[in-house]
From Swiss-Prot:
Species of provenance: Candida glabrata (strain ATCC 2001 / BCRC 20586 / JCM 3761 / NBRC 0622 / NRRL Y-65 / CBS 138)
PROSITE patterns, per the entry: FCP1
GO MF term list: identical protein binding; mitochondrion targeting sequence binding; protein transmembrane transporter activity
Protein family according to the UniProt entry: Belongs to the TIM50 family.
Species lineage: Eukaryota, Fungi, Dikarya, Ascomycota, Saccharomycotina
Protein's job: Essential component of the TIM23 complex, a complex that mediates the translocation of transit peptide-containing proteins across the mitochondrial inner membrane. Required to direct preproteins in transit and direct them to the channel protein TIM23, and possibly facilitates transfer of the translocating proteins from the TOM complex to the TIM23 complex.
InterPro entries: FCP1_dom, HAD-like_sf, HAD_sf, TIM50
Residue spans crossing the bilayer: 121-137
Any single Gene Ontology cellular-component annotation: TIM23 mitochondrial import inner membrane translocase complex
Protein name: Mitochondrial import inner membrane translocase subunit TIM50
Amino acid sequence: MLSLFRCAVTRAPHIASKGISVQISRNLANSLIVQNKRRLNTKSYFLQEQKKDDKKAQSILTDDLLFKAGIDVEEGKKEGQQKQHETEEGNEEQQSENSSNKKRKRRMTSADKKKERYANYFYIFTFSSLAGLGLYMCRDWEENEDDEMKKDIDNGYTPDLMYKRFRARFNSVFTYFQEPPFPDLLPPPPPAPYQRPLTLVITLEDFLVHSEWDQKHGWRTAKRPGADYFLGYLSQYYEIVLFSSNYMMYAEKIAEKMDPIHAFISYNLFKEHCVYKDGVHIKDLSKLNRDLKKVMIIDTDENSYKLQPENAIPMDPWDGKADDKLLRLIPFLEYMATQQVEDVRPILKSYHNKRELPAEFEQRVQKLKNKFEQDQKKKNDSNWLLKLLGLAPVINGIGGGNKFPLDMIREEGEKNYVRFMKLIEEEKEKMRIQQEQMSGQTFTLKDYVEGNIPTPEEQMKMQLEKQKEIDALFEQKKKEQQANK
């Protein structure tokens, strides 16, 4: 011990010169000693825990016993390992996604920040524009706005009135697509001498025609038996409006085939002229510019006349098979037109089942006819003087007696129909000759470029001369036909 002290004293100057390095080495040695102690403590702790686990009671059911009992121990272990592997993979994927999202957030460049700022500006501008538009739609009414929209809504800046004006203006935006293109679908009616007493609106599809498709022939359209007679006969009593349930591009050609020279049908309307409401297209009779007291509609779809069901005569859709339902409708429609009816709606309402209207009308007519015959018989029996002279008229119009009024109306209607059809045939022939003569009277693009087009006055003179030639040719052919007969 003394020798060590002496050695330290003798070497003190040398150690003092290296004091800093010795101090550092001592600190490092101390830290290494502390770390080694910690490791020894943790190892001893784990060894103690392992001994405790070994001392725990083990299960009696070993793997050998379970295997002898028929239980597959290895499969259960494999499944457990597989599930553990899947959960570990899921955790790894979730951690990778979270880390990637964090990296994306950290990777925002100046361009991304600029885009985000512009997007915020856009949202602010859009919201402020919508708010300004909403306030503008709450303003007081202007003079040029629709009167129907102003109805029952006054000016003022109370919350209730502002909301009502906003709602009315907002709904008017959508009514542009729901309403017909014009407020009045038909022009004003002609003056009294040329005006028909009633307006009859009839549908085209499954009433006058029926279209069907098959693989062999494609689309085919059949015309209902009696359709030409139905239109021609009733055209002398009614202003007939053909209101198709299909779009114009599909139904216009069929409508033209039904009446090529527009002699029977006054106007054609299509699906574009319907009102779209509650998901269906409705044929609104109030848009026809006609008095609803004088309008009737015949249709096969209940939705078509749901706004005016009291003006409707419902019919079952025609399936393309031959029938006589069109002809059976004529007597009732003729009666309505010839009786100078003030309002058609109460008369239509008096029928219990409108779909069987022709049959019910025939029953009523038969009752009236029986009563009329009985009255005529009583009159003839009371006139004993004519009986003595042998001049008593025969009942029911045979031999010059009085006729039933509806029979007389029908006979007169048949005569007018024959005369009218004769005029139509002559007009068709005249139109055919006119088309043949006018087909060669055309002007080419060369005539337009060179200025060889006649003036409007010269064109009018040419048309008048051509019309005279057509009339003379038509009269000549007419005389030839009469001579051949």
